[in-house]
């Protein structure tokens, strides 16, 4: 009752093949693989990006004396 038998999986496979067709499933898997590769490349690029040399070098400060409210 708790687990699926071979017949259950066979029926699910047939339904998936009917809905998506034989040509659509490899195309879908290829798109998933491209997404995974792109994600891994993005994660690797993020690790290789060096931090800025001095974060405060480009920062500008503004000194302003607030006027008193009467």
Curated annotation (Swiss-Prot):
Residues 61-70 have a biased composition (Basic and acidic residues). GO terms for biological process: protein transport by the Tat complex. Disulfide bonds: none annotated. One of its GO terms (molecular function) is protein transmembrane transporter activity. One of its GO terms (cellular component) is TAT protein transport complex. It is found in: Cell inner membrane. The chain crosses the membrane at residues 1-21. Residues 42-70 are annotated as: Disordered. NCBIfam families: PRK00720.1, tatAE. Part of the twin-arginine translocation (Tat) system that transports large folded proteins containing a characteristic twin-arginine motif in their signal peptide across membranes. TatA could form the protein-conducting channel of the Tat system. The Tat system comprises two distinct complexes: a TatABC complex, containing multiple copies of TatA, TatB and TatC subunits, and a separate TatA complex, containing only TatA subunits. Substrates initially bind to the TatABC complex, which probably triggers association of the separate TatA complex to form the active translocon. Belongs to the TatA/E family. This is Sec-independent protein translocase protein TatA. The lineage of its organism: Bacteria, Pseudomonadati, Pseudomonadota, Alphaproteobacteria, Hyphomicrobiales. The gene is tatA.
């Amino acid at each position: 009752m708790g687990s699926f038998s071979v017949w259950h999986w066979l029926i699910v496979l047939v339904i998936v093949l009917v809905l998506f067709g034989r040509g659509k499933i490899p195309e879908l898997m290829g798109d998933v693989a491209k997404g995974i590769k792109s994600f891994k490349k993005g994660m690797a690029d993020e690790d290789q990006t060096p931090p800025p040399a001095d974060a405060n070098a480009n920062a500008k400060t503004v000194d302003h004396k607030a006027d008193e409210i009467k």
